Structures are given as structure tokens and as C-alpha cells.
């Protein structure tokens, strides 16, 4: 691909970098050392270098100073209001005493991780789109996942479909490329993986009218930003089965297949794993795919990291008719069983809330387990074939079946965490149902092609609590009766963090950050903050002290089912902040 630099935007972007010249910040900048490739693959225990700390996406920290016994002694070390109002799904990173934050509108801030002092701030000049492009404006202002640290840089994917490389010490733009066409509707809501001098990320906006025919995972050279490969998630000419799965729908009339969450990477096999979202239009009645599975939507893809070649795929929800996308984090774990090590990929990939365990070397289905109330999947065969409840598939306009879970339920973008110490996967979930009704809609620039009307989100019959943390025992085979569930009225609105201190940490729409015992599910500590807990809690150690970082702010998850717990009001405004705790010195 020809490299296209936006020189005018680059000049403006540089002018928007604020560098704070205070003595302490200057010292932190001067001591900052490059993040090597080996560090990305094996990060120091005290640091958090990638979206989920390690690029297997486990979300686990080996730190244990904050533990079951000491968590009650947490106190606030410092707090920081994030740069802009709006939706907040930040994933903080920490290296060499610098805490990096990215919030909406692609603003990146570098803070002293010990004091909370600002070191630098980067505010990009973003491409302007018309106000009537409502869906694109909404999606492009919610940056999921993260930036990435590599060598002496911060790698950023932007809402206007650029890849930008910043200097980690000063936030100045080093290079950038327009990776996809923002005028068609493409945007990045997914942070990158950077490994082996390659930036791997995935584009979003693929259910917007102008993006028909292509949704992509792509790799760029870290040093030159030239494209190395791209993989189309809804049009694979090398796979006749994939083409046939869309029925008579030609590639130019296909939408969807967005990889909404950052993938994982296995260095042993040089494989990157990505989850793929729903098709569009959402109902086959409108999209014209008849009873086809519409590959590779709602699938896990295993790609060669050097070439982008497809190694295998597994489809978790074929023939989606309800916007129950399955793109969320794919987690790589190794488990011992029968004297052998088995390489697994585990995930609760989507909104129907079903847990899957796959052999990550072959894609073989091993087992699955339901977590929340769902009525869409009727059964899964021993070979992994997924069967649907045909009664819920709309066959005429005006039909409005009740679907559980809902478009806002089950597993959403909030990531789970896996502890290798307990061999459990901890998942934040939401119980919810809604009706779905297919519509005939005109597709306009900058707006979605879903063509569906969703009813109010309600709790499933017999369920009185929206929020759920489910601890799932992970093995080669299913373990009946192991693990635990912790239910609560308010929905879960943050990702989870697991630590060697025996804790699982996350929070909810009711503004509570909580620490659960990772073996029993007992809540050991909680504190109410200024706004719903959001983003991705994380932890690091600096100068002998372990710190816990808790982001807060409003996200799409915060209000999606708030009517189910009216006694817990959600504050107006956003309250986008980070609260940083450490153990009391008293």
C-alpha cells in the first residue's frame, strides 16, 4: 500500500502537543528506557505494557502486595480528571514510572505514575465529518482498548482511521499514515498490537453505509508504516465456503464483520487471534443471505502474523439475526492435564454470554458453558456446531421476538481476566433481554446499516439483578460445579483485573469499585466513586509500592439497562477520571 502522510494535519497535531517543563517531569522523561520486543512478550512484573498487560490478553498481574489481607488498607494516592467529556473506555499503561492514558477523541496523556503530575498531552487534529453522520460520530468518539508502547514510542490508532506514532518522552508526532478512508466511514475503535516491528490492528465502522464489501485486520511496518497485509473479514475469495455462506449477497452488498476488540498473539506459533462482530443488516430477512452462516461474522480468526494468511476459524454464532456480535477479547492460556500441556483459546466472545474453550493450535472446539440467561442458541454439538432457536428468527416485517440476552446484555466490551493461579476466567456480565424488529431502512452516508428496532432492555423472567461476575474453571474438559458467581443489582461497567494477591477487581454502574476474593467471590473491599467504574482497571509497582488504577466515567454500558435498577441513579455528566490507590503507610 502506498504510504500517505497527512502533512498539514501532522503540523497541527504537533502544535497540539503540550510538554510540561517541571523538574520532576523532566527527570522522569530522561530516565525513560525503550520498551523492547522481549519486554512486550515478557513484561516485567511491576509494569503494564499492553492492553491486558500481556499480549495473551489474560489481564493478570503477578503483584501481590495488595492482597486479600491488605486490600482493606487501600487509600487514595492521587486522582486525575481526564482530558475530555464523552464516553470513556480507557486502558492505562505504565512503563518506567510513566502512566499513559488515552481517552475519547484520541487524546493521550503521560502522567508521573507516582504523583499524578502531567508530563505531556497530545491532542490530535481530527478529520471533521458532517453532523448528520450520526452513527459515525458516535462510534468514532468512543476509543476502545488502548494505545501500545514499543521502543521509545506510543502507537495510537485514531478515530479518523490513521496510525500515529508519538515519542514516548514528549508526545510529539514521529510519523503517521492514513490507513483507511475516513470518508467512507472507517474509523479505529481498536488499539494495536505491536510485536516484531509490526503494528497489527483492525478497522471499525464496517456497518456504516460507505464501507460495504470490506472490513479488515491489517498489519503495518512499525518503522515505515507501510502496509504489510490486510485480511477481509466478510469477503475471502480464497474460501468458497465463506463466499457461499452469504447466499446470493455479493461482496459489494455486505456489511459488518467488525473486529471490535484488540487481538492476542502467540509467539510460539507466530499467530494472532481476533474476534469478529455481527453481520449487517442484522436480520437475514433484510440482508438477503437466506439461511447462510455469513462467515466470518461472530467468529474467531487465527492469522499468520507475518502474512495475514488464515490458519483456522471457528464461528461462535452463525446466522446472527439480532446484533449479538461476538468480537470481544480472545485469551490464550496453557493448562496441564494428564501430564500434558494444552494450548487453549478461551473467551466469552459475545452478547449471548456463552463461554468457549478451543484448541488454539487447530481451532478445535473443546467445550462451552452458558453464563447468563439466553434463548438464541438451542444447543452446541460435540463437534462445536452451533444450533439456533429458529422460532426467534424474524421472517416478516413487524415480528418482534423477545431475545435474551439483549443488544446490551451478556458479554460486552468489558474484558474478563484469567488467573493462572486459580485456573479461573473471571467475566463481567449483564443479564438483559429485548425485542428485535427488522426494518426496511434507507442507508445514508455516515449512518448504520443495521435496519433493526430494539425494544427496552428488561431483566429476564425470574432475575432481579442485572450485574454478574462469573468465575469459570478452565481445563481441557468442562468442570461441573466449580467456580463461583457474584450477583448484584447494578450492571457491570468495567473490565476485570486478576492479581496474584488473590483478588479480582472491577466495578459497576452504581459507582462502586470492588475487590472480590478470587476463590470464593466474597467482596473484600469496595469504595464508591464519582461516576460509573469504567475502562480497564490495572496495577503496577513503583519504588516498592503497588498501585491500583481505577478509571471512572460514562460508557454505553452504564445506562443501557439502568431502568432495571432505578433505585441506583446514574449521575449526569461523565466524571471521566482515574483514581490511583496504594496501601496506607500508617
Regions found by a protein language model. Give the residues of each.
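Repeat-blade elements of multi-bladed beta-propeller folds
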Residues: 48-52, 87-107, 135-163, 187-209, ...
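Blade/loop signatures of beta-propeller domains
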Residues: 27-76, 233-240, 388-392, 458-459, ...
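Short, conserved, GDST-rich strand-edge loop motifs in beta-rich repeat architectures
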Residues: 201-216, 274-294, 400, 431-462, ...
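N-terminal cofactor/phosphate-binding cores enriched in small/glycine residues
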Residues: 57-179, 498-499
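Loop/turn-rich, solvent-exposed surfaces of beta-rich toroidal or solenoidal domains
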Residues: 334, 429-431, 461-522
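Extracytoplasmic beta-rich repeat domains
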Residues: 80-93, 121-151, 176-191, 232-262, ...
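Beta-propeller blade signature
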Residues: 214-226, 290-309, 358-363, 467-475, ...
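Blade-level signature of beta-propeller repeat domains, shared across WD40, Kelch, NHL, RCC1
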Residues: 538-586
Amino acid at each position: 500500500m502506498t504510504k500517505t502522510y497527512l502533512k498539514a494535519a501532522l503540523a497541527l497535531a504537533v502544535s497540539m502537543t503540550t510538554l510540561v517543563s517541571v523538574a520532576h517531569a523532566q527527570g522522569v522523561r530522561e530516565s525513560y528506557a525503550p520498551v523492547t520486543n522481549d519486554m512486550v512478550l515478557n513484561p516485567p512484573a511491576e509494569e503494564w505494557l499492553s492492553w491486558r498487560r500481556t499480549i495473551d490478553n489474560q489481564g493478570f498481574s503477578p503483584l501481590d502486595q495488595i492482597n486479600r489481607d491488605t486490600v482493606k488498607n487501600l487509600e487514595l494516592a492521587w486522582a486525575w480528571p481526564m482530558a475530555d467529556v464523552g464516553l470513556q473506555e480507557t486502558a492505562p499503561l505504565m512503563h518506567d514510572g510513566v502512566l499513559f492514558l488515552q481517552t475519547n477523541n484520541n487524546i493521550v496523556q503521560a502522567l508521573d505514575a507516582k504523583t499524578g503530575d502531567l508530563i505531556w498531552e497530545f491532542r490530535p487534529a481530527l478529520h471533521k465529518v458532517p453532523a448528520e453522520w450520526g452513527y459515525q460520530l458516535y462510534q468514532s468518539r468512543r476509543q476502545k482498548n488502548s494505545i501500545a508502547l514499543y521502543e521509545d514510542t506510543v502507537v495510537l490508532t485514531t478515530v479518523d482511521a490513521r496510525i500515529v506514532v508519538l515519542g514516548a518522552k514528549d508526545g510529539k508526532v514521529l510519523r503517521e499514515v492514513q490507513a483507511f478512508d475516513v470518508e467512507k466511514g472507517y474509523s479505529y475503535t481498536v488499539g494495536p498490537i505491536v510485536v516484531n516491528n509490526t503494528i497489527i490492528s483492525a478497522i471499525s465502522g464496517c456497518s456504516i453505509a460507505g464501507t460495504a464489501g470490506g472490513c479488515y485486520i491489517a498489519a503495518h511496518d512499525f518503522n515505515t508504516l507501510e502496509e504489510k497485509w490486510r485480511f477481509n473479514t466478510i469477503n475471502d475469495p480464497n474460501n468458497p465456503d465463506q463466499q457461499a455462506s452469504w447466499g446470493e449477497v455479493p461482496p459489494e452488498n455486505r456489511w459488518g464483520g467488525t473486529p471490535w476488540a484488540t487481538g492476542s498473539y502467540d509467539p510460539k506459533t507466530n499467530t494472532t487471534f481476533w474476534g469478529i462482530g455481527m453481520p449487517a443488516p442484522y436480520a437475514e430477512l433484510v440482508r438477503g443471505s437466506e439461511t447462510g452462516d455469513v462467515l466470518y461474522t461472530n467468529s474467531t480468526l487465527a492469522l499468520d502474523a507475518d502474512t495475514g494468511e488464515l490458519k483456522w476459524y471457528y464461528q461462535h454464532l452463525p446466522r446472527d439475526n439480532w446484533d449479538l456480535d461476538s468480537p470481544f477479547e480472545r485469551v490464550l492460556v496453557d493448562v496441564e492435564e494428564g501430564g500434558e500441556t494444552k494450548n487453549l483459546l478461551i473467551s466469552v466472545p459475545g452478547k449471548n454470554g456463552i463461554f468457549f474453550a478451543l484448541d488454539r493450535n487447530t481451532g478445535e472446539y473443546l467445550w462451552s458453558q452458558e453464563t447468563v440467561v439466553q434463548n438464541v442458541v438451542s444447543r452446541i454439538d460435540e463437534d462445536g456446531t452451533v444450533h439456533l432457536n429458529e422460532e426467534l428468527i424474524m421472517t416478516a416485517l413487524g415480528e418482534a421476538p423477545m431475545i435474551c440476552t439483549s443488544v446490551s446484555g451478556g458479554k460486552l466490551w468489558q474484558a474478563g481476566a484469567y488467573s493462572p493461579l486459580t485456573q479461573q476466567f473471571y467475566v463481567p456480565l449483564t443479564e438483559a433481554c429485548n425485542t428485535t424488529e427488522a426494518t426496511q431502512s434507507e442507508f445514508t452516508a455516515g449512518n448504520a446499516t443495521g435496519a433493526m428496532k430494539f425494544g427496552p432492555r428488561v431483566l429476564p423472567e425470574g432475575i432481579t439483578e442485572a450485574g454478574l461476575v462469573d468465575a469459570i474453571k478452565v481445563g481441557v474438559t468442562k468442570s461441573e460445579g466449580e467456580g463461583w458467581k457474584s450477583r448484584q443489582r447494578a450492571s457491570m461497567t468495567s473490565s476485570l483485573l486478576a492479581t496474584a494477591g488473590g483478588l479480582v477487581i472491577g466495578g459497576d454502574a452504581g459507582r462502586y469499585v470492588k475487590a472480590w476474593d478470587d476463590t470464593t467471590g466474597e467482596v473484600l473491599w469496595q469504595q464508591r466513586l464519582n461516576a460509573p467504574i469504567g475502562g480497564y482497571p490495572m496495577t503496577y509497582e513503583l519504588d516498592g509500592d503497588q498501585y491500583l488504577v481505577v478509571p471512572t466515567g460514562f460508557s454505553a454500558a452504564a445506562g443501557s439497562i439502568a431502568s432495571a435498577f432505578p433505585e441506583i441513579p446514574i449521575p449526569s455528566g461523565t466524571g471521566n477520571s482515574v483514581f490511583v490507590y496504594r496501601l496506607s503507610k500508617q
